[in-house]
Amino acid sequence: ERLRAGDVLDDAGQPLGPDAPHRVRQRVWYWRALPSEPRVPFEAELLFRDDELLVVDKPHFLPMTPKGRYLHETLLVRLKRQLGLDTLVPIHRLDRETAGVVLFSLRPASRQAYQAMFRDRQVEKVYEAIAPWRDDLVLPREHLSRLEEDPQTFMQMRPVPGEPNSRTHIALMERHGDWARYELRPVTGRRHQLRAHLNELGIPIAGDRIYPTLWPEPPPDAEPDYRQPLALLARAIAFTDPVTGQTRAFESRRTLAWPAQSQDAAG
C-alpha cells in the first residue's frame, strides 16, 4: 500500500513502486504515518514552471522535506500531491523557519547541472532580514568568520578561530525605530550562515528560536505557535540556466512584517 501511494523513496527522493527492481545495498526511505502531524496553515505559491524547473515561494513554518514530526505537511510532499510530479526534487534548501524562493528539479537528466550551479557558487541569492538597529555598526560590510557546529547544543553554529569558511555581504535597507531591514547576500552556504552572522554582530534576527539562545522545546502534543515567524526571507535568486542558457531571475512576493514593539515605538 505504501509503495503504491508513493510513500517509499530512494536516496534521490524518487518514489519506488511495487515493481521497482531491487539493488544491492540500496537505501530506501519510508514515509511513516504520523497521526498527530499538525497542519501548517500556510500555502506555497508557484512562481514559475517549465520542463526542467519549478520555482516556489515557500511560506514560513513549512519544512522543505519530511523530517521529525512532519511528513505530509512539507513543501515537497504537498507539491508532489498537488501537481502529480513524482520526479520532483529540491535543488537547494531553506530552513523550516525561512520563507522565500526555492527551486525544484523536474527531470533527473538535468538535475545534476542545476545542483552544480549551487555547488560552484554560480547562483546569486539575495535575502532580507529584520533585526535590531545598531548605530555603531558600519554598513555596508562584508562579514567573514569560521562557523562550526556548537558541540554543546548541536543546533547552533558558532564562530571559532581559524580560516573563514563563511562570507556574507550585509547592507542596510531601511530603519524603523529600534529595528532595521537588512539586505544579505551570502557568498558561501554554511548551515544557519545568515542567522549566525547577524547574531555575531549583536543583531540576531527577529523571531529566531535558535540565536542567540535556544527557545524551550514545546511538548510534543503542544499546538504550534505561529505568532512569531523568523524575519528572514529568501527574496530573490538569479542564475544562467545551464540547460537553456537563459538568464533566470525570480523574486518572492512575500514581505516581512516589522515586530510589534517597533510599530509601537514608531507610533
Where do the PLM segments sit?
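RNA pseudouridine synthases
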Residues: 1-267
